[in-house]
Amino acid sequence: MKARGSRENASKRRPSQTQYDTHLRTNQRITITRTAESHELVNQRHKIFTQSFLRTFRNQQVNKRLTKKNHLGIKKSSIVTL
């Protein structure tokens, strides 16, 4: 019977430090080769999304305030009529 931490399973558990370093290096190379131009579309999409999200969020906040005011107005008017 083999020991639990056998060498065969070691590679499955976690990459060695050298593998990890090469992985990092390739990722760095990829990020360096990406220019601002390639990110421009992503940035535009993100900007459009955030603008629309903020718009809907602001509208929700305004609606909340208005409904609160209306409720308060209804309560006040009902008290006055009594």
UniProtKB/Swiss-Prot annotation:
Residues 16-25 have a biased composition (Polar residues). Residues 1-25 are annotated as: Disordered. It comes from the Viruses. Residues 1-11 have a biased composition (Basic and acidic residues). This is Uncharacterized protein IRL7.
